[in-house]
């Protein structure tokens, strides 16, 4: 992959035997994260339940980058399973395991098995800003119109 940045990754013992996250098409934006739950005890999410799902993955993002953990559209569309804190942010200085907070918004229990692709991780540059106090702000045609103010 030309222009790719290198990210060092480690797998914890409970992820042994699982492949590193990978892109599953040539134009995919996200690397698929897999569940590192025990083979013998899959995780069952009842309808309305949420759980932290381990991936067994630790990464060292370069300065100026972040990773976002986002839902997989197929899980959401077919089963109502999504990432509860979407997008979950992984900061460049974080060196702990990446876990995925999944919620089952569907009507039936959903079983998460070892190695199942449960979320996608997008790595992107971060723009840092410096906020400055201001007495007034420039006017816009939208003004303070918020949720739904621009129509359907």
UniProtKB/Swiss-Prot annotation:
This is Deoxyuridine 5'-triphosphate nucleotidohydrolase. NCBIfam families: dut (TIGR00576), PRK00601.1 (NF001862). InterPro entries: dUTPase (IPR008181), dUTPase-like (IPR029054), dUTPase-like_sf (IPR036157), dUTPase_trimeric (IPR033704). Pathway: Pyrimidine metabolism; dUMP biosynthesis; dUMP from dCTP (dUTP route): step 2/2. Keywords: Hydrolase, Magnesium, Metal-binding, Nucleotide metabolism. Substrate binds at residues 72-74, 85, 89-91. This enzyme is involved in nucleotide metabolism: it produces dUMP, the immediate precursor of thymidine nucleotides and it decreases the intracellular concentration of dUTP so that uracil cannot be incorporated into DNA. The gene is dut. SUPFAM superfamilies: dUTPase-like. Its EC number is 3.6.1.23. GO terms for biological process: dUMP biosynthetic process; dUTP catabolic process. It comes from Nitrobacter hamburgensis (strain DSM 10229 / NCIMB 13809 / X14). GO terms for molecular function: dUTP diphosphatase activity; magnesium ion binding. Belongs to the dUTPase family.
